[in-house]
UniProtKB/Swiss-Prot annotation:
GO cellular component: host cell membrane; membrane
Species assigned in the record: Escherichia phage If1
Protein keywords: Host membrane, Membrane, Signal, Transmembrane, Transmembrane helix, Viral extrusion, Viral release from host cell
Signal peptide region: 1-18
Name of protein: Virion export protein
Gene: IV
Annotated TM spans: 320-340
Origin organism lineage: Viruses, Monodnaviria, Loebvirae, Hofneiviricota, Faserviricetes
Length: 429
């Protein structure tokens, strides 16, 4: 609702002075309420009376107030119907004709000395007395809806109520209602925020290796000179890094993702899980998800009324698989500060529970890179154990000798998850 910009300099006796009234987009209901309290006359407002009114520099005396009130209402499509009390309603030409019978001067004796002070934020707050102006601002480089909150905060720096910011016309214009001084300041401020956002291409390789896997990763991570990576890890050979059970990391120069894929293909003990690629704006999140939407039982109907063969169950569905979320921010110096959050969920083969069991591995961190550098994150270990029994039918049941025809085996599989992430600033042509 638009605010009322009013200046009612009426603190002295209404018997001797006129009321200087200035209204700018004032709610008509506030105006009627002020009139009722000023004259002491009860007024009923019809439910369909809505909208705003504007009046500039109207000096109204005590004898002119009823006529002024009725004229303002009629100019805005409303009328004051006679009665006890009178009713403010929409003007209907089929029912009413213009008449001054509703606006005869009110005797001075009906006023109680001084004019009562107007009530409500629109009348009482001095900071809303400024005149507001509405202008449009074309947005050339970003979406108007993204820029609107920034402009709104800028306008609220001054204590002037009634300022508004609306995105318009297919998100390429901003409609701004503010004071003249604010528009002048906004004209200088606007070009500093209406600038193109930098795009960031995030490429990733998510893979698993076994704890004993010793495939050579050096040609994928090292550069031709064999220089060490950030953090002091030697790129000549990363076997010890990739087979460690703790957290692993490294920052590499150059695009090593393609070479790392070749290294993974030559290893029989590595598994490529996903290769997400995300193009997003600086400061905006980018998300990649690949997996299944699995139902989990959350409740069952029990008791005599339950159908044993087909019981009623309530379920909830959750995504199980690989997910990657990044929020890159490009600094003025060209660095990339990136929030990284990844999850690798899988369904367990365990039968010890009555419902599905999921294995979860996740990483959430913030890294700082130069454009084109690659970071290695890892160390998420998953231990999988399985037991199997095999036997010869019938013969394995024979006492004493049946054990000779039965075999048992157990397998332990320890796999470690690694993530290679490369971020690169993409400039528009």
């Amino acid at each position: 609702m638009k605010k009322l910009l009013a200046s009612l300099l009426c603190v002295l006796s209404f018997q001797s002075f006129a009321i200087p009234v200035e209204l700018n987009n004032a709610p008509v209901r506030e105006f009627v309420s002020w009139y009722s309290k000023t004259t002491g006359k009860p007024v009923i407002i019809s439910p369909d009376v809505k909208g705003e009114i504007t009046v500039y520099s109207a000096d109204v005396t005590k004898d002119e107030l009823p006529q002024f009130f009725t004229s303002v209402l009629r100019a805005n499509g409303f009328d004051l119907s006679p009665g006890n009390p009178a009713v403010v309603q929409k003007f209907n030409r089929n029912t009413y004709e213009y008449s001054d019978s509703f606006s005869e001067p009110v005797p001075a004796s009906s006023y109680d000395g001084d004019v009562p002070p107007p009530t409500g934020d629109f009348f009482t707050k001095p900071e809303i007395r400024a005149n507001l102006i509405t202008q449009t601002y074309p947005v050339n480089n970003v979406r108007a809806k993204d820029l609107a909150p920034v402009i709104d905060i800028f306008l609220k720096g001054e204590n002037i109520a009634g300022t508004k910011v609306y995105p318009l016309m297919g998100r390429i214009f901003l409609l701004v209602t503010a004071s003249a001084s604010q528009h002048k300041e906004l004209a200088a401020f606007f070009p500093s925020v209406d600038v193109p956002r930098t795009q960031v291409l995030v490429e990733s390789v998510i893979f698993e290796t076994t704890a004993s896997d010793g495939f050579d990763f050096s040609f994928a991570a090292g550069d031709p000179s064999g220089s060490p990576v950030a953090g002091g890890i030697n790129t000549d050979r990363l076997t010890s890094v990739l087979s460690s059970t703790g957290g692993s990391f490294g920052i590499f120069n150059g695009n090593i993702l393609g070479l790392s894929l070749k290294a993974l293909e030559t290893s029989s003990k590595s598994t490529l899980l996903s290769m997400p690629r995300i193009l997003t704006m600086s400061g905006q999140p980018g998300t990649f998800t690949a997996g299944q939407n699995v139902p989990f039982v959350t409740g069952r109907v029990t008791g005599e009324a339950a159908n044993v063969n087909n019981p009623f169950q309530t379920i909830e569905r959750h995504d199980v698989g690989i997910s990657l979320k990044v929020v890159p921010v490009v600094t003025p110096g060209g660095l990339l500060i990136m929030d990284v959050s990844t999850n690798a969920d899988s369904i367990s083969d365990s039968q010890t529970a009555s419902d599905i069991i999921t294995n979860t591995r996740s990483i959430s961190t913030t890294v700082q890179l130069k454009s084109g550098q690659t970071v290695l994150l890892g160390g998420m270990v998953d231990n999988r154990e399985s037991d199997s029994d095999s036997s010869v039918p019938w013969v394995s049941k024979i006492p004493l000798i049946g054990a000779l025809f039965t075999s048992k085996s157990s397998n332990a599989n320890k796999r470690t998850l690694y993530i290679l992430i490369r971020a690169r600033v993409v400039n528009l042509l």
